Regions:
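C-terminal compact regulatory domains
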Residues: 1-131
Length: 131
């Protein structure tokens, strides 16, 4: 059950932010979506608040998604288990592997389909404890 999920959306493109927020809010009851526009903001937000999942764009200014994921994983403890899902238009096998090597948990190609997004979120969050 994804109800009430706390999701950090890390994306620098305003249109993509709007689309992702709309999809998440239309699909998940009581979802909480916070936005970070680059990797530096993402790491700061993850340190400041508990999230169930991070949706991470990989190509961003200041700090990309790979480096942000590595920085989050380096925090240790529960941060090593935090689901981080890559969002990228590049679906080449090498790109998917690069995301996994950086410590990401899953992968969603952009532009994403609502069903694909929800299936990925369900599979990643199926073990989360309800508050």
């Amino acid at each position: 059950d994804l109800k009430g999920a706390r999701i950090l959306l890390v994306e620098d493109n305003d249109f993509n932010i709007m689309v992702a927020q709309d999809e998440l809010q239309a699909s998940i009851p009581d979802v909480q979506v916070d936005v970070a526009k680059n990797g530096i903001e993402a790491v700061a937000r993850v340190k400041a608040k508990t999230y169930d999942l991070v949706l991470m764009d990989v190509q961003m200014p200041e700090m990309n998604g790979y480096d942000a994921t590595r920085a989050i994983r380096a925090l240790g403890g529960t941060y090593e288990q935090l689901p981080i899902i890559a969002m990228t238009a590049n679906v080449m096998k090498a790109e998917v592997q690069r995301c996994i090597d950086a410590g990401m948990t899953g992968f969603i190609p952009k532009p994403f389909e609502r069903n694909e997004l929800l299936a990925t979120l369900h599979s990643v969050l199926s073990g989360r404890q309800g508050e």
